[in-house]
Amino acid sequence: MAKAVRKSNSEETVPIKAPRKAPGEKIPVVSIVGRQNVGKSTLFNSLLKKKLAITEDYPGVTRDVLSARVYQEEKDLDFYLCDTPGLDIENPDSLSQSILEAAYRQLNESDVIIFLLDKNLVTVADHTLLDYLRKKYGPVDKPIIYCVNKADKELDEFDLEEFYRMGLPEVLPISATGRKNLGLLLEKIKFFLSSKPGKVWIEKISASKKKDAQPLPLAEEDYEFRLAIVGKPNSGKSSLLNAVCGYERAVVSDVAGTTRDSVDTLLEFGNRKLLLTDTAGIRKHSKTAEALEYYSYQRTLKAIESSDLVIHLLDAKKGFGDFDKKITSLLQEKGKPFLIAVNKWDSIEDKTDKTFREYKEKLYSRFPLLNEVPIVTISATERLRVQKLIDLSFDLASRSRRKVSTSELNKNLKNWMSQAGRSFSAHQPPKMLYCTQVSTSPFHLILFVNHVEYFKSNLISFLKKKLTEAYDLQGIPVRLEFRSDRK
C-alpha cells in the first residue's frame, strides 16, 4: 500500500471529493524518476502544495513509492502522481534491491514519466538512466518529459546546451523550490495524457426489438476522435449525418452521450473508427426566429465542447451569415480543429471552373481566418463527395496530434523572426528566449520573451502563418502565448 503524503498544519489541504471513473476506466499515472538528490521529492511536494492534491493512495503501489491523486476539475487534471526512489543505487543490499525493483515496476505502470535532471551536475548515472529509458520505452510507447531542476535564474538556449547534447528532444527548465514553470509542467502532463486515442464503453443491444431484449455485456471500443457536425438551422446537418452513417461498414452501437440530449454513434471505416456526436432536435417548436437561433446556438456549443474535431456545415445558397460567423468564432475560442463543408453544391446553377474559387474569395472576405481552413463542396442528399469529407476528417484528426520538439521550434521561430526583422522597432526589438509546445489541439505554444508588448499583431500573425505552413496546421487553431518571465 502506498504511503500517504504527510502535510504540516501550515500546508494542510482541504480534502476534495474526486469523481468515480466509468467502469474499467483507469486513472492515469505520472511518475517522477531520476538519480538521487536531483530534487524528485521536492518536485513531488511542490506540485501537491499547489492545492491540487486529494489525500488518496494510488492502489497497488508498494510502500516505497509515495503517491497522491492530483485532481482539478476546472483545468481537466486528474492523475496519480508518484515519487520513486533514486535509481542509481550501486551494489544494493537485499532491501535496496527490493526498493529498486518496486521503482522499475512503477515505471511500467506509468502513463507519463518525468525524468528529472540537475542543472548544476550531469553524472554517469544520468546517462545510464537515460539509456535505459530510451531502450525500454520508445517515444510512442510512453511519453517522457525531460525536466532540468534548480533552474532558478532565467535561462536561454546556451544554458541548456549540455542537455541537448545528451540527445534530448525537449528540455523543460524548472525550479521545484521556487515553483518556476510548474504550471507549464502540469500543462505538459495534461498535453500527453489527453493526446491518447479515445475509448468508450458501450452496451450492445441484441437484435430483438422487444422490451425484454437483454443487453450484451459492456464492451470497450477504441476510436480515433469524436466528431461533431454543426451549422445553422436547415443547413442540412441531418442529411449529412444520414449520408455519413450510410458510408460506414458497420455501425457498432449507439452510446449515451456526454449531455442529456445527445447520442454518440461509433462508426467504423475499414479498420478506423470515429465517434459521431449527434445532438437531438429541439423538442418544442420555437415561436420566434430569435428563440430558434438561441436553442441552436446552445446545442452547437454543447456539440463543440464534447468533440475533438468539427465539421462546420454551410448552405451553398445562403452563404456565410452571422450565425456561421458565431460558430467560427466559437471554434477558434474553444481551440477545435475544423473544416468547412459547403452543402447543397448541386443546387448551384451554371457552375464554371471559377465558381468554387469565387465562393472561397467571398468567404475569406467575410472572415479572413478561414483562409487556413480546408473547404470541400458536397451534397448530402446526393452523397456527393461525402467520402472525401470523411477522408479529410481523418487526415485533420491525424494532423491535429502533431508534436514538435522544443529544439526544432526554437530554431525555426528564431529564423522566422530574423526574416521579419525589418518590421521590428529599433528601440524595442522583440527577442524570444525559449518556447515549448503545451498542446496539440489547439497547437499551443508558450514563448518566453524579453517584453510581451514588443510582439506586435503583425509579427504574431506572421509567426502563426509560418507555423501553419511548416507543420501542415490548416484547420487547426494556432495559439501563441507570450510570457515575460518563467514563473
From Swiss-Prot:
Gene3D superfamilies: 3.30.300.20, P-loop containing nucleotide triphosphate hydrolases (3.40.50.300). Pfam families: KH_dom-like, MMR_HSR1. GTP 1 binds at residues 34-41, 83-87, 149-152. Keywords: GTP-binding, Nucleotide-binding, Repeat, Ribosome biogenesis. Residues 28-197, 225-401 form the EngA-type G domain. Belongs to the TRAFAC class TrmE-Era-EngA-EngB-Septin-like GTPase superfamily. EngA (Der) GTPase family. This is GTPase Der.
